[in-house]
Amino acid sequence: MKAPVRVAVTGAAGQIGYALLFRIASGEMLGKDQPVILQLLELPVDKAQAALKGVMMELEDCAFPLLAGMVGTDDAEVAFKDADIALLVGARPRGPGMERKDLLLENAKIFTAQGAALNKVASRDVKVLVVGNPANTNAYIAMKSAPDLKPENFTAMLRLDHNRALSQLSTKLGKPVGGMEKLVVWGNHSPTMYPDYRFATADGASIADAINDQEWNANTFIPTVGKRGAAIIEARGSSSAASAANAAIDHVRDWVLGSNGKWVTMGVPSDGSYGIPEGVIFGFAVTTENGKYTLVKDLPIDDFSQKYIDKTLAELEEERAGVAHLLG
């Protein structure tokens, strides 16, 4: 048996956490031969800690052969101790009448503290995925608060947007998602992100040629993917938890086990490619191998695409400016 991998999960008793933990413990994220130790963080309030205890009881009752151990805590330094993978799911949700900038600042406090805790106690090769929104900026804050860890260890989740875009294209074309490749979602995990199928193929044939409808792209496809989260809240009465958990598993699985040459979308610190300032955490197409991701470089950007990329970058720059004073 392999040595267990330590997986830290914040917001572990929340809706996404509940949809995530059982799949990690069953081996869906890291493979059916990889034992895991779950290190679970919840808020230091009685209700959250009691809920966490209940989730841990259920995990025990599944008798997962790969679950080598569990820790439940309200202390980030306990949760992140020697963590190989950290899924930062917990974030302050936007309350009624709350401005986006207030939400940014509330979350900045959380992710500054979590970045510092990771910096202090996590494995030096920890792979961090930020799921809690605003994910790109929260990942940026955590990265900046962990100066001893490599910036490339910090990523934000755009895989949900990527998967949503694949599904919309599948419906439009009547083709299965399994045969689709070379889709990319650029930018921020927000309604400004830009799902781009110019390079994408379905069973080897160009998707752009098959659709050949720029009006559908601009007026239906892009807004549908961008507003899908809001549509689910409207329909379900609460936010997309199972699909977010599924995307987190996809993101980490590909990062750790490799994407076999396929493009996947990850929010990663820019190296200056495509005119995105260095260090901004931005959605790019990447391929992954041996636990490392590589940006897909030199894709042509047409005027239509540039407009969307500029817009999502402007939003990220504005968010970054809004928290700059907290990062020294």
Curated annotation (Swiss-Prot):
Gene3D superfamilies tied to this protein: Lactate dehydrogenase/glycoside hydrolase, family 4, C-terminal, NAD(P)-binding Rossmann-like Domain
Residues of the signal peptide: none
Keyword NAD: yes
Active site: 189
Highest rank taxon of the organism: Bacteria
Residues annotated to bind NAD(+): 11-17, 107, 114, 131-133
One biological process term in Gene Ontology: tricarboxylic acid cycle
Catalytic activity: (S)-malate + NAD(+) = oxaloacetate + NADH + H(+)
UniProt: substrate binding residues: 94, 100, 133, 164
Molecular-function annotations in GO: L-malate dehydrogenase (NAD+) activity
Transmembrane segments: none
Keywords, sorted A to Z: NAD, Oxidoreductase, Tricarboxylic acid cycle
The protein's enzyme class: oxidoreductase
Entry's EC annotation: 1.1.1.37
Role this protein plays: Catalyzes the reversible oxidation of malate to oxaloacetate.
Family of the protein in this entry: Belongs to the LDH/MDH superfamily. MDH type 2 family.
Name by which UniProt lists this protein: Malate dehydrogenase
Organism, scientific name: Stenotrophomonas maltophilia (strain K279a)
